[in-house]
């Protein structure tokens, strides 16, 4: 299959290099268009007030992988690839492998998930892949999961669904299995470290700690939430969509229409 891969960690990240190289080994035609630097937590931002630059990169990936480094955001990269750089549209857009989890409400901030969602917006089935650790360096099990999912998914897949996949940071033999999950809750205690620059003006660094939470599971609910499943060393597969409408409220708030 023809695959487009992007990320938010940048072209030098081990996660995207491992993923692209493994997919080429599996027989896929792979093009990488990703940021030229770290772009984590940029959400679905686009570059509108300055030019976007893209240049071919050689020597970082398997020679069979075509690689572009882009000055824009992850969403810019996918939009530019689909609109200009690729001669043919891909069968799938993949994003990752992210250096860190994208669980629960993380997906609202994630450049990794947003890059994949851009593919869905353009009508192409997409997968976001995240290794659930900021320090782990072995991306091979996660890359193997990507190969397996592409083999098992129907082709063509639904173009309106993004699969957000989180892989536990354990050896392959310790992965408990693959679970279809719903989105959980993952909140943070935000802290702002205030400092003063050499000119005497204050500036701030956003820091903080994650508060691991998950919504209570209903007895009849067979689908775990992603936060719970990853704790138990399951690969989590969470279907997401760009339609954020709260449909139950349409009838409850119908009296507002006039």
From Swiss-Prot:
Question: Which SUPFAM superfamilies does this one have?
Answer: SurE-like
**Enzyme Commission number(s) from the entry:** 3.1.3.5
GO molecular function annotation: 3'-nucleotidase activity; 5'-nucleotidase activity; exopolyphosphatase activity; metal ion binding; nucleotide binding
Is this entry keyworded Ribosomal protein? no
Query: Which note does the record give on the cofactor?
Result: Binds 1 divalent metal cation per subunit.
EC class, as a word, reads hydrolase
Gene Ontology cellular component list? cytoplasm
Give the binding site residues for a divalent metal cation: 8-9, 40, 98
Q: Which cofactor does it need?
A: a divalent metal cation
What's its job?
Answer: Nucleotidase that shows phosphatase activity on nucleoside 5'-monophosphates.
Tell me the protein's name.
5'-nucleotidase SurE
What gene is it encoded by?
surE
């Amino acid at each position: 299959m023809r695959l487009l891969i992007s990320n938010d960690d940048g072209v030098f990240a081990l996660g995207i290099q491992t993923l692209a190289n493994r997919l080429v080994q599996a027989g896929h035609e792979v093009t990488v268009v990703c940021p030229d630097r770290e772009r984590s937590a940029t959400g679905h931002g686009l570059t509108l007030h300055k030019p976007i630059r893209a240049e071919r990169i050689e020597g970082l990936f398997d020679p069979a992988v075509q690689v572009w480094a882009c000055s824009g955001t992850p969403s810019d990269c996918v939009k530019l690839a689909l609109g200009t750089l690729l001669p043919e549209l891909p069968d799938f857009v993949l994003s990752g492998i992210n250096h860190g989890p994208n669980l629960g409400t993380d997906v609202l901030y994630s450049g990794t998930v947003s890059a994949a969602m851009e593919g869905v917006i353009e009508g192409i089935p997409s997968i976001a892949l995240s290794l659930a650790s900021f320090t782990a360096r072995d991306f091979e099990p996660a890359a193997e999961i990507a190969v397996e999912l592409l083999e098992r998914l129907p082709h063509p897949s639904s173009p309106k669904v993004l699969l957000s996949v989180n892989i536990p940071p354990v050896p392959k033999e310790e992965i408990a299995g693959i679970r279809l999950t719903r989105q959980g809750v993952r909140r943070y205690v935000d802290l702002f470290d205030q400092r003063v620059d050499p000119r005497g003006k204050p500036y701030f660094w956003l820091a903080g700690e994650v508060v691991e939470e998950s919504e209570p599971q209903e007895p009849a609910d067979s689908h775990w939430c992603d936060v719970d499943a990853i704790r138990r060393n399951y690969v989590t597969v969470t279907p997401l969509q760009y339609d954020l409408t709260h449909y139950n409220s349409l009838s409850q708030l119908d009296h507002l229409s006039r």
